[in-house]
Amino acid sequence: MATYAIVKTGGKQYKVAVGDLVKVEKIEGEPGTAVSLAPVLVVDGSDLTTDADKLAKISVTGEVVEHTKGPKIRIHKFKNKTGYHKRQGHRQKLTVLKVTGIK
């Protein structure tokens, strides 16, 4: 059975396993830098672990592969009868991580 963990980073939860490439909210660090993903919520290997005391001792490590941007999101604000309209765009900064270990 493959070991996986559910980690929380950037306000979102991700299910990761060793060797996975995951796009997460931007994390500081140059490509090749090792990072640790802190709150581990669940670990499943030979048995499912959800106990907070055991999870505090478990860490998920990864390596920064690259920094990239998400898709362009277009925002358009419009108010009727006043001639007011405003266009805006946004691209979220993302980091691609390769999960190297669940210990």
From Swiss-Prot:
One of its GO terms (biological process) is translation. Keywords: Ribonucleoprotein, Ribosomal protein, RNA-binding, rRNA-binding. The keyword Glycoprotein does not apply. The keyword Ribonucleoprotein applies. GO terms for molecular function: rRNA binding; structural constituent of ribosome. It comes from the Bacteria. One of its GO terms (cellular component) is ribosome. It holds the Pfam family Ribosomal_L21p. Belongs to the bacterial ribosomal protein bL21 family. Part of the 50S ribosomal subunit. Contacts protein L20. This protein binds to 23S rRNA in the presence of protein L20. This is Large ribosomal subunit protein bL21. The gene is rplU.
